[in-house]
C-alpha cells in the first residue's frame, strides 16, 4: 500500500524545518518523483486531460485503489497529493475551478508563499497539450527519467500557478464550483477517507 511508498522516504522529509531556500519544493518534488516512478496515468471520463466537463461525481477512490490501478483523475490526484503533503507536514491547499481541481502547498511556515501543481501531469501526458506554443515534446528526446520528472514537475507548477492567477478572484469568491481549501491538521482530522 501507500504506506510503504513513503515509509522509506519519509526520513528525508523535514516539512518546514529546513530554512534552506527551495527546501519545501525539493520535498514536494521527491513525492512527485515517487509517484511518477509508480507509473501513474491520468484518467478522465472524457479522455481529454484538459476537458472542462470532468464530472465531479466520480467517487474519489481510496489511495490503494488509485495506486493499484495507476489510473488517476484530477480529483483523485489532487486529494492523494494533498494527503501525502500533509503526511510530511507541508500544508496543502485544494483548489477547484469549474470542471477541474488542482493542489497547492505553502512553501513556508508563515504561509506567505504558495505553489500549485497540476497533478494530472504526473502521468503519461503530452506536454504539448498543456503548452502548445513551446513544442516541449521535441525537447524530451534523450532525457533521463529523472530529468523528465523534474521537467514535468516544473512545468506542472508553471501551469497550475498560471491557472490559479487566472481564476484567483473566483477561487476566493465562495461561488459555486470554486473552492480554496487549506488542509490544516484540524481539517485533516475531520475528513474521513471514503471507504471502498
Segment roles from a protein language model:
Residues 1-6:
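Short, small-residue-biased leader/transition segments that mark boundaries at the very start
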Residues 9, 34, 66, 139, ...:
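Residues that form generic nucleotide/phosphate-binding pockets
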Residues 16-22, 26, 81, 88, ...:
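Mixed-charge, low-complexity segments
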Residues 19-20, 69-70, 120, 155:
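A generic structural signal for short
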Residues 24, 37-39, 43-102, 106:
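Active-site neighborhood of thiol-dependent amide/isopeptide-bond enzymes
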Residues 75-168:
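Hydrophobic/aromatic-rich core segments of domains that either
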Residues 151-196:
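Low-complexity, Gly/Ser/Thr/Pro-rich intrinsically disordered linker/tail segments
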Amino acid at each position: 500500500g501507500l504506506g510503504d511508498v513513503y515509509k522509506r522516504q519519509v526520513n528525508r522529509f523535514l516539512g518546514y524545518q529546513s530554512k534552506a531556500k527551495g527546501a519545501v519544493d525539493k520535498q514536494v518534488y521527491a513525492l512527485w518523483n515517487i509517484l511518477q516512478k509508480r507509473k501513474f496515468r491520468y484518467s478522465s471520463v472524457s479522455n481529454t486531460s484538459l476537458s472542462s466537463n470532468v464530472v465531479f461525481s466520480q467517487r474519489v477512490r481510496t489511495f490503494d485503489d488509485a495506486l493499484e490501478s495507476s489510473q488517476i483523475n484530477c480529483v483523485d490526484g489532487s486529494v492523494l497529493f494533498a494527503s501525502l503533503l500533509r503526511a510530511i507536514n507541508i500544508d496543502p491547499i485544494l483548489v477547484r475551478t469549474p470542471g477541474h481541481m488542482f493542489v497547492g502547498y505553502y512553501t513556508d511556515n508563515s504561509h506567505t508563499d504558495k505553489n500549485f501543481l497540476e497533478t494530472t501531469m504526473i502521468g503519461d501526458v503530452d506536454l504539448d497539450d498543456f503548452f502548445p506554443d513551446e513544442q516541449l515534446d521535441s525537447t524530451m528526446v534523450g532525457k533521463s527519467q529523472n530529468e523528465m520528472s523534474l521537467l514535468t514537475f516544473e512545468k506542472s507548477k508553471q501551469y497550475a500557478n498560471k491557472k490559479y492567477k487566472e481564476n484567483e478572484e473566483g477561487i476566493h469568491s465562495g461561488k459555486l464550483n470554486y473552492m480554496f481549501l487549506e488542509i490544516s491538521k484540524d481539517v485533516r482530522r475531520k475528513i474521513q477517507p471514503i471507504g471502498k
